[in-house]
Amino acid sequence: MSRSAAEFLKPQNVASTHYLDNRVYWDHEIFEEEKKRIFSKVWKFVCHVSEIPSTFDYRTIKVADTPLVVIRGKDEKVRTFVNACSHRGIQIVRRPRGNAKTMECIFHRWNYDSTNGELTGAPRKEAYGPSNFDLKQCGLREVRTETYLGLVFVNLDDSAVSLSEFIGDALEMEKDILGAEELEVFDYYEQVLDTNWKNWQETNLDLYHEFMHFANRKTGLTVKEYYQRAWKLYPNGHAAIERYRAQYSNYAGWQDRDDGIRLPGLHPNEFQLVNLFPDLAINARGTVIRIDSQTPISPGKTLVQYRGLGLKRDSERERVQRVRDYTSIWGPFGTNLAEDTLATSLHAKTIQTGSVPFTYLTRDEGGMTQDDLGLRTFYREWERLMSRQANQIR
């Protein structure tokens, strides 16, 4: 039965944890608070160690609007610095990736050591003496950086807990995949989506939406074991789903895949998914790993970065096969990823206008596969950090 305006604007009589006020997706005040209370306070994934393999290799990124450069020093330690000159705040490193023995500001040619961030040179520096300006105190700001299972994380909050305490046991089911052999990123793709960052993260927490995916309907939803997996919840908003073996032979082309290149710890048909709050998702499937991470741009615009990982020791033939396995499903023109990007953009077309007041997280299957438990866990942590309820913004 259809509803009147009054009925439509009133939430159903469900628990407060089971629905959202949709202003969490489009309210500018909420978005600014998220940057301060979440992205400036928690550990944020920035890259895989294989992306900066050599001394002085770097990558640039933004976290909570703060420009950062992640760089491997001459001591082989990975560090992160705020990518801004201590003099006038000019952005120093301008390329998304590269190699720099020193980092030089183009404005006044101030130079910084790429290992420790120390200011190593400034033209005509004697003129700073009369003003009592101490150039020794002009090093770059270093940001906390830690690595776990090849994943590089940063934290803008110097008083935050350690990375290991933040992650806890959330990657326990991924250790044999991520840590058994040396991996490397073989595919990198990014796109700006017209959607809120939480909408994209939800695609990796909401397994009920797999009815949308043609490939999933053919290979997963036909398997009894698919529905018998339990969600595993961890502190700090992390969630993972137990593994299962899909019937990939039902999907045209899978029979041509080489099981000999499967990842350590995975059966050729096995699938594993882990979500680390707030924005990291690790999908492992037989022969490939996909890592999703995000940079929120505005309430309705998000930069999503996708990384494909495989074994570094691959032969040329094995790498060609692994790339094919990855791109056919998870590449920009693959059967799966494009469907998710379409869904999130269609969601934004109504949510961002304020046309729909509520989102419901009401599926309850005893914590099994298509339960909304993962979503509710995410928003419970969101509420804790934001100090507000997600179902009642004002």
Curated annotation (Swiss-Prot):
Start and end residues of each Rieske domain: 43-154
Report the EC code(s) recorded for this entry: 1.14.12.14
The UniProt note on temperature reads:
Optimum temperature is 35 degrees Celsius.
Question: Which amino acid positions bind Fe cation, per UniProt?
Answer: H209, H213
Q: How is the cofactor bound?
A: Binds 1 [2Fe-2S] cluster per subunit.
Name the residues that bind [2Fe-2S] cluster. C85, H87, C105, H108
Annotated keywords: 2Fe-2S, Dioxygenase, Iron, Iron-sulfur, Metal-binding, NAD, Oxidoreductase, Plasmid
Question: Which pairs of Cys residues are joined through disulfide bonds in the record?
Answer: none
Its catalytic activity?
2-aminobenzenesulfonate + NADH + O2 + 2 H(+) = 2,3-dihydroxybenzenesulfonate + NH4(+) + NAD(+)
Q: If you read the UniProt record, what top EC class would you report for this enzyme, in one word?
A: oxidoreductase
Cofactor(s) in the UniProt record: [2Fe-2S] cluster; Fe cation
Xref: InterPro entries? Rieske_2Fe-2S, Rieske_2Fe-2S_sf, Ring-hydroxy_dOase_2Fe2S_BS, Ring_hydroxy_dOase_asu_C_dom, Rng_hydr_dOase-A
CDD domains xref list? RHO_alpha_C, Rieske_RO_Alpha_N
* Family (UniProt): Belongs to the bacterial ring-hydroxylating dioxygenase alpha subunit family.
For this entry, the protein name equals 2-aminobenzenesulfonate 2,3-dioxygenase subunit alpha
